[in-house]
Amino acid sequence: MSLISWLRWNEAPSRLSTRSPAEMVLETLMMELTGQMREAERQQRERSNAVRKVCTGVDYSWLASTPRSTYDLSPIERLQLEDVCVKIHPSYCGPAILRFRQLLAEQEPEVQEVSQLFRSVLQEVLERMKQEEEAHKLTRQWSLRPRGSLATFKTRARISPFASDIRTISEDVERDTPPPLRSWSMPEFRAPKAD
């Protein structure tokens, strides 16, 4: 009997997850929504108990049991939210949850408003995904476009001394005068003499 089998007896069997990334994102986002709805309901209950306590002057909260959650999503609304959640890319799941929590902390919505807030965050994330995808597509098109280098540009005209085709008055005068003596630091450009 080998020692390896004894060492592996307490390890969990390694199995690959059969869930797709979209399913995992869906489950994570819907769990976040459910948890935040429970938390909003608890806060709403605490606020109503505090108001009741101020109005009556007596605290009977120790006597009452915690009621079950009273608000739940309708099946149609749940399916619509799940349909939107499936479209979210896994890399945007974390930022979507952070944005949702940030809005909940800022606004402190009622339980009924939490699902609409969640839907608005998901729409915002989908818009951001679409914008980044378009920017990435433009970047890819730009990088795949053939570029011309400076070495491929060829001059169409060479710089060389040439005789002008346009006759001027000063040209007749210049033709009869001998060319000036050049200085040794400058190259000499002369038109070829036609014999």
UniProtKB/Swiss-Prot annotation:
Residues 23-52 form a coiled coil. Residues 170-195 are annotated as: Disordered. It comes from the Eukaryota. GO terms for cellular component: cone photoreceptor outer segment; cytoplasm; endosome; nucleus; perinuclear region of cytoplasm; photoreceptor inner segment; photoreceptor outer segment; rod photoreceptor outer segment. Changing C85L: Reduced the affinity of RD3 for GUCY2D. Changing R68W: Less effective in suppressing GUCY2D activity induced by GCAPA. InterPro entries: RD3 (IPR028092). Keywords: Cell projection, Coiled coil, Cytoplasm, Endosome, Leber congenital amaurosis, Nucleus, Sensory transduction, Vision. Expressed in retina. Widely expressed (at protein level). In the retina the strongest immunoreactivity is detected in the inner half of the cytoplasmic portion of the photoreceptor layer, where rods and cones are found, and the external half of the outer plexiform layer (at protein level). Changing C93V: Increased the affinity of RD3 for GUCY2D. Changing L29F: Reduced the affinity of RD3 for GUCY2D. Pfam families: RD3 (PF14473). GO terms for biological process: negative regulation of guanylate cyclase activity; protein transport; retina development in camera-type eye; visual perception. Changing E108K: Does not affect affinity of RD3 for GUCY2D. It is found in: Cell projection, Cilium, Photoreceptor outer segment; Photoreceptor inner segment; Endosome; Nucleus. Monomer. Interacts with GUCY2D; negatively regulates its activity. The interaction with GUCY2D promotes the exit of GUCY2D from the endoplasmic reticulum and its trafficking to the photoreceptor outer segments. Interacts with GUCY2F. The interaction with GUCY2F negatively regulates GUCY2F activity. The interaction with GUCY2F promotes the exit of GUCY2F from the endoplasmic reticulum and its trafficking to the photoreceptor outer segments. Interacts with GUK1; up-regulates GUK1 activity. PANTHER family: PROTEIN RD3, RENTINAL DEGENERATION 3-LIKE. It is linked to Leber congenital amaurosis 12: A severe dystrophy of the retina, typically becoming evident in the first years of life. Visual function is usually poor and often accompanied by nystagmus, sluggish or near-absent pupillary responses, photophobia, high hyperopia and keratoconus. Plays a critical role in the regulation of enzymes involved in nucleotide cycle in photoreceptors. Inhibits the basal catalytic activity and the GCAP-stimulated activity of GUCY2D and GUCY2F, two retinal guanylyl cyclases involved in the production of cGMP in photoreceptors. Involved in the transport of GUCY2D and GUCY2F to their target sites in the photoreceptor outer segment. Up-regulates the activity of GUK1, a kinase that also plays an essential role for recycling GMP and indirectly, cGMP. Plays an important role for the survival of rods and cones in the retina. This is Protein RD3. It comes from Homo sapiens. The gene is RD3.
